[in-house]
Amino acid sequence: MIFGIGIDIVELHRIENMLSRQARFPQRILTEAEYARFTLLSDKRKIEFLAGRFAAKEAFSKAYGTGIGKELSFQDIETGNDKAGKPVLACAKLDCATVHVSITHTKEYAAAQVVIERLSR
């Protein structure tokens, strides 16, 4: 049973501007494991990676129904990849049964969609 669906789109130049103005922006958005991957990327790829993870976490928060705030932070949500390279998403504090995520990039945008199938609160 579907609990929630969320989608988010972000302009890459907005993320690039945030990164140039706030050096700690990636640490606010990314978990330690995500940040470790981020540091290995080229500058161009860093922006795409950060924008994609930002969009995925925003999409998850919308699917969950709370948005990012008191109940859910960027640090509570972690993205990764399975053995085949497919993006996966997990939430640290929440009991999420099944979460599906899709992340995409273009020259100007990053977008993500999340479907939560079952959820225990």
Swiss-Prot record:
It catalyses: apo-[ACP] + CoA = holo-[ACP] + adenosine 3',5'-bisphosphate + H(+). GO terms for cellular component: cytosol. Mg(2+) binds at D8, E58. One of its GO terms (molecular function) is magnesium ion binding. It is found in: Cytoplasm. Keywords: Cytoplasm, Fatty acid biosynthesis, Fatty acid metabolism, Lipid biosynthesis, Lipid metabolism, Magnesium, Metal-binding, Transferase. It holds the Pfam family ACPS. One of its GO terms (biological process) is lysine biosynthetic process via aminoadipic acid. Its EC number is 2.7.8.7. Belongs to the P-Pant transferase superfamily. AcpS family. PANTHER family: L-AMINOADIPATE-SEMIALDEHYDE DEHYDROGENASE-PHOSPHOPANTETHEINYL TRANSFERASE (PTHR12215:SF10), PHOSPHOPANTETHEINE TRANSFERASE (PTHR12215). This is Holo-[acyl-carrier-protein] synthase. The gene is acpS.
